[in-house]
Regions:
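Immediate post-signal-peptide N-terminus of mature secreted/exported proteins
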Residues: 19-66
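Sec-dependent bacterial lipoprotein signal peptides
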Residues: 1-23
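Charged/polar positions within long, soluble alpha-helices
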Residues: 44-51, 55, 83-97, 120-134, ...
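C-terminal amphipathic alpha-helix
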Residues: 39-43, 104-151
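Long, amphipathic, charge-rich alpha-helical segments that form helical bundles/coiled-coils
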Residues: 71-119
C-alpha cells in the first residue's frame, strides 16, 4: 500500500511538473498576430485621418500659421507611424523557426515589444489627429473589422 501511494504521488508530481504556467512561443506568436490584426484596422484610420488633415491643409481653411505648422507635423507623425508598421510587417517572420523553444520565444517576445510600441504610436497619433479633426468639424473614421483575415 505504501508503494502504491508513493507511486501515485510520484506520478502526480511528474504531471504537475510537466504543466507549464508560462506561455509557449506559439501563444506569444498568436498574441503578436492578434495585435497585428488590430493595427491593420487602426492603420486604415491613420491613413484616412492623414488624408483628411492633408485636405484641410491644402484647402486654406487653417486658422493660423501655427496651426498649419502643427498640422504638417501631425501629418508627418501619421506617415511615420504608418511607415513603421509597414517596416515591421516587412521584416516580421511569421514562420520563424529557431534552434529551440527558447530561441522561438525570444524572437516572438522581441516582436511583441516592437508591435506594442507601434500600437502605442498609433494610439497617440490617432488621438491627436481625431482631436484636430474635431476642431475643424470633421468626423474621424471608425475602424472596420477584418472578418475574413486569416493567418
Amino acid at each position: 500500500m505504501k508503494k502504491f501511494i508513493i507511486i501515485q504521488l510520484g506520478l502526480a508530481l511528474l504531471f504537475f511538473a510537466a504543466c507549464k504556467t508560462e506561455p509557449d512561443a506559439n501563444a506569444v506568436k498568436k498574441e503578436v498576430l492578434n495585435i497585428h490584426d488590430k493595427l491593420m484596422m487602426d492603420g486604415e484610420k491613420v491613413v484616412k485621418n492623414r488624408i483628411k488633415l492633408d485636405s484641410i491643409l491644402k484647402s486654406g481653411k487653417i486658422k493660423s500659421a501655427v496651426d498649419s505648422l502643427k498640422m504638417s507635423t501631425l501629418i508627418n507623425q501619421l506617415n511615420k507611424a504608418d511607415e513603421r508598421m509597414m517596416d515591421w510587417m516587412h521584416f516580421f517572420k511569421d514562420d520563424f523557426k529557431g534552434k529551440n523553444e527558447q530561441e522561438n520565444m525570444a524572437y516572438y517576445k522581441s516582436q511583441m515589444i516592437k508591435v506594442r510600441a507601434i500600437e502605442d504610436q498609433y494610439i497617440q497619433v490617432t488621438k491627436v489627429s481625431d482631436s484636430v479633426l474635431r476642431n475643424y468639424n470633421i468626423k474621424s473614421v471608425e475602424t472596420t473589422e477584418m472578418k475574413n483575415h486569416k493567418h
